[in-house]
Amino acid sequence: VNYIRVMKIKLFILSLFLSSNFLISQTNSKKQFLVNTIAFYNVENLFDTINDPKTRDDDRTPKGRDKWTNIIYQKKLKNIAKVIADIGSDLTGSAPSIIGLCEIENINVLKDLINTNSLKEENYQIIHYDSPDERGVDVAMLFKKNRFQLTSSKTYPLYLKRKNGSIDYTRDHLLVSGYLDKDLIHFIVNHWPSRSGGQMRSEPGRILAGKLNKKIIDSILKSNPKANIISMGDFN
């Protein structure tokens, strides 16, 4: 399957058997497949405690509505890291080779996450771009550099128009391409507009997000009709 679409979920796990990367046993001719776990996780407002005047993050500050102290922040990091470390470990013995994330405030929280006790030995690398989302949440990807060779990454902005003609800035789509072991795979990380305000009112935003996703996929398939594409995310 070249294109895997994941519908609305908070945590998605895919154990990928790479058929082109099998190992031949010296004692018999059985194929032994390399297994990679690929996951997506909506970490639900992973914010640091620092107030960013450019975004609406006031609730996630020590004096904000959520009383977002460093103790609470560190606890959230620890809990998320434990979940990630356990994903697919029964098959691979380690954390996922690739994990897409959404509701990330900035690159600093990603650095804090990969340096937790549960993940610091996994040697994760970060792919992140600041998006124009008004709440300040972004999508991102973590990958193990010993399993994934990055070739390119790019963001695609999604602009929604309000009734008064102004622009509603939301999350970008993130495209990451590279070799997972020896297979070239393209990953699209999504976080589509929510149903805030009701499904009917918010549906046009998700339709535009779907069209943008298809545009990205079509551009890849135009270059290689047999390209391996995984589109992951919270599709709301």
What are these regions (language model features)?
Residues 1-31:
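Bacterial Sec-dependent N-terminal signal peptides
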Residues 23-117, 127-139:
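N-terminal, active-site-proximal structural segment of metallo-dependent hydrolase catalytic domains
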Residues 34-37, 94-98, 121-124, 181-185, ...:
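Loop/turn elements at helix/coil->beta-strand transitions in domains of secreted/extracellular proteins
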Residues 37-45, 152, 184-194:
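Active-site-proximal beta-strand elements of phosphoester/diester hydrolases
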Residues 44, 105, 193, 235-236:
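Catalytic metal-binding/acid-base residues of hydrolase active sites
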Residues 54-57, 183, 187-202:
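Active-site His/acidic residue clusters
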Residues 104-184, 192:
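Structured beta-strand-rich core segments of catalytic domains in phosphoester-bond hydrolases
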Residues 195-236:
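Flexible, glycine-rich surface segments
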